[in-house]
UniProtKB/Swiss-Prot annotation:
Function summary: Single strand-specific metallo-endoribonuclease involved in late-stage 70S ribosome quality control and in maturation of the 3' terminus of the 16S rRNA.
Cofactor note: Binds 1 zinc ion.
EC number of the protein: 3.1.-.-
Residues the entry annotates as binding Zn(2+): H118, H122, H128
Species in which this protein is naturally found: Lacticaseibacillus paracasei (strain ATCC 334 / BCRC 17002 / CCUG 31169 / CIP 107868 / KCTC 3260 / NRRL B-441)
Protein name: Endoribonuclease YbeY
InterPro entries: MetalPrtase_cat_dom_sf_prd, YbeY, YbeY_CS
Top EC group: hydrolase
Length: 152
């Protein structure tokens, strides 16, 4: 996995940056994605995540993660052999992640991991709006977190 991680406001320390990078690589292996798969994660604060949520999802509130998947359509050009595939971008608000960790009574690392895996699965076509989709996504999310060692 080729991950671009942006933290212009230094919302997290190097230890947490490393956790994100390692977890994304682990997720890529769990889903058997090609090694040259690309994505980005941008860490933002409450004001920015609320603005993005309002502008792109028409929801005027903060949230922990917003995903923008790059989905292939019939008009897309086929990838050349060895060419990287970009699956999309995540915007994560560590401040909201920290509040969720406190609300749920577990570590910030576990909640950050949950948020990264959850967003990663969305970038790969998983969803949880319909019960039948949720029945696939949530167990996979739990399986990945447990295999990585991030349990409640």
């Amino acid at each position: 996995m080729d991950l671009e991680l942006f933290d212009d406001d230094q919302l997290l320390d190097d230890k947490h940056h490393d956790l994100i990078k390692k977890l994304v690589a682990f997720c890529g292996k769990q889903l058997k994605l090609p090694e040259n798969t690309e994505m980005s994660i941008t860490l933002v604060g409450d004001d920015e995540i609320e603005r993005i949520n309002r502008e792109y999802r028409e929801t005027d509130r903060v949230t922990d993660v917003i995903s923008f998947a790059i989905e292939e359509g019939e008009d897309d050009l086929p990838l050349l052999p060895g060419m990287a595939k970009n699956i999309g971008d995540l915007f994560i608000d560590p401040l909201t992640v920290r509040r969720h960790a406190e609300d749920y009574g577990h570590s910030f690392e576990r909640e950050l991991g949950y948020t990264v895996v959850h967003g990663f699965l969305h970038l790969n076509g998983y969803d949880h709006i319909k019960p039948e989709d949720e029945a696939v996504m949530i167990p996979l999310q739990k399986k990945i977190l447990a295999a990585y060692g991030l349990t409640r």
